């Protein structure tokens, strides 16, 4: 943590890359930081000891992007026209090399198992984006299982990948994994230049694509499932130079763009206005409202059978249980928006990378002037400047912040309080298995053995997962790791 009145300093400096670092991401609940350089090397850093756990050359050219897929897969995108999905679990790291690219290595470094390989276009210098396949609530879905749970399980097995089109540099291809088939080709204009940055995600039960172009234009488009076409919802040109990076807020209510110029723009993400494709469904909806009013005035259920329920209400209830019988909704957006929410001239040209933290409060940029700048997402005001590197920075990444971690850093927390609130206490359960709590005196006594049982490894792991890491990759091949917010 930075001391008041003194400039912040990095928590750690990770030295190992021989070439400039182009990509970085946190995986496995912040246990690992994965970085990629201009020579195609990938390093998986163990943040409990700040040492490499796996080093291999993933591509024959520069790394454009890295992302984690679940806890056992890593996606890398290189300028050798390849996008590769690697399988790397904890047990696999034991056979991997830990010899850094800086150190000479006589023998070739072993590589993880390749699960999927896509031939893609990398002439744009545009990294990929990914999202889970949309998971609607199925008729056979168990009661109480939320759509988020279904989508999370779908994310473990299926994925959509967005990359620039192989032939037309202004178009975007969307591939499906694991089938490795192309699902969509999206072309949102002819005179915008190359695609420079993309983001793909699900919003309002529809697939949403955000694209930044060479002429400084940013576009948001939704896919209409009925027309099988992409409908623009927003477009604005806020930059005089090519867009270098974009980041979508976790709440899916806005996105940010940075460029080779000094402008940072905050753009809206319009919501989709749904409209039923048939008047029959509209009539059914009105009938459902009438049925609900009838049910509210009907007698209370007695036993296992409802008394006084209308036949229409029973039919509609059955229809609700089978969503597939309802017609698809056509997405009818309103007028295309053309004005950003806010723009700011930072006076610092060339903000290569931009990323919003998972809590949506702040975002950071990596600048060509070697500085990492932190801004407020609400006001776009600069709140911190992190200076350590002597040359330009090309990559920035935030660790995932758990919703219940409100403290600025693990260093400011009381270790005893942490253990007492997060540790399990089986001694406090009664004979029936109910989670009753003992008095405060007994509760304080159970804290001491918990502290003793924690090993050094456990403490480091707890600290690595709870820290609010900010990683920055630079042209000098070094990665600075900060914990300041």
UniProtKB/Swiss-Prot annotation:
WD repeats lie at residues 16-55, 58-96, 238-277, 346-385, 451-485. SUPFAM superfamilies: WD40 repeat-like. Residues 273-304, 317-339, 406-440 are annotated as: Disordered. Its main location: nucleus. Residues 406-431 have a biased composition (Polar residues). This is ASTRA-associated protein 1. Residues 274-291 have a biased composition (Low complexity). It comes from Neurospora crassa (strain ATCC 24698 / 74-OR23-1A / CBS 708.71 / DSM 1257 / FGSC 987). Component of the ASTRA complex involved in chromatin remodeling. Component of the ASTRA chromatin remodeling machinery complex. InterPro entries: WD40/YVTN_repeat-like_dom_sf (IPR015943), WD40_repeat_CS (IPR019775), WD40_repeat_dom_sf (IPR036322), WD40_rpt (IPR001680).
């Amino acid at each position: 943590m930075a001391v008041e009145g003194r400039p912040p300093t990095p928590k750690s400096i990770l030295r190992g890359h021989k070439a400039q670092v182009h990509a970085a991401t946190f995986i496995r609940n912040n246990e690992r930081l994965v970085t990629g350089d201009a020579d195609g090397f990938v390093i998986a850093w163990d943040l409990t000891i700040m040492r490499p756990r796996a080093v291999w050359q993933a591509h024959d050219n520069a790394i454009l992007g890295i992302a984690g897929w679940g806890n056992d897969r890593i996606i890398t995108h290189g300028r050798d026209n390849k996008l590769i999905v690697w399988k790397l679990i904890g047990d696999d790291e034991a056979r991997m090399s830990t010899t850094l690219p800086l150190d000479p290595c006589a023998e070739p470094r072993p590589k993880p198992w390749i699960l999927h390989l896509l031939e893609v276009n990398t002439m744009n210098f545009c990294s990929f984006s990914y999202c889970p396949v949309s998971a609607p609530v199925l008729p056979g879905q168990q009661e109480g299982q939320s759509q988020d749970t279904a989508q999370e399980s779908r994310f473990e097995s299926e994925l959509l990948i967005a990359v620039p089109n192989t032939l037309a540099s202004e178009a975007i291809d969307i591939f499906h994994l694991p089938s490795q088939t192309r699902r969509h080709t999206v072309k949102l204009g002819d005179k915008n230049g190359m695609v420079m940055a993309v983001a793909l995600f699900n919003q309002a039960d529809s697939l949403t694509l955000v694209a930044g172009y060479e002429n400084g234009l940013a576009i948001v488009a939704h896919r209409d499932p009925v027309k099988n076409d992409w409908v623009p919802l927003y477009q604005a040109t806020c930059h005089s130079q090519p867009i270098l990076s974009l980041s979508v807020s976790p709440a899916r209510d806005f996105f940010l763009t940075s460029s080779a110029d000094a402008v940072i723009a905050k753009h809206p993400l319009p919501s989709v206005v749904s409209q039923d494709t048939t008047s029959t469904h509209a009539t059914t909806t009105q009938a459902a409202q009438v049925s609900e009013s009838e049910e509210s005035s009907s007698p209370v259920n007695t036993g296992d059978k409802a008394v006084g329920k209308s036949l229409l209400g029973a039919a509609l209830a059955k229809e609700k249980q089978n969503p597939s019988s309802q017609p698809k909704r056509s997405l009818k957006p309103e007028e295309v928006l053309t004005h950003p929410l806010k723009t700011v001239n930072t006076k610092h040209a060339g903000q290569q990378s931009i990323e919003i933290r998972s809590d949506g409060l702040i975002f950071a940029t990596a600048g060509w002037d070697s500085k990492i700048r932190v801004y407020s997402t609400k006001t776009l005001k600069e709140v911190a400047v992190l200076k350590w590197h002597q040359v330009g920075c090309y990559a920035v990444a935030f660790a995932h912040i758990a919703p219940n971690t409100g403290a600025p850093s693990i260093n400011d927390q009381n270790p005893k309080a942490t253990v007492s609130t997060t540790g399990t206490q089986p001694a406090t359960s009664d004979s029936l298995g109910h989670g009753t709590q003992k008095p405060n005196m007994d509760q304080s006594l159970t804290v001491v053995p918990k502290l003793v049982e924690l090993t050094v490894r456990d403490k480091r792991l707890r600290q690595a997962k709870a820290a609010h890491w900010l990683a920055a990759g630079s042209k000098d091949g070094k990665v600075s790791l900060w914990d300041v917010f």
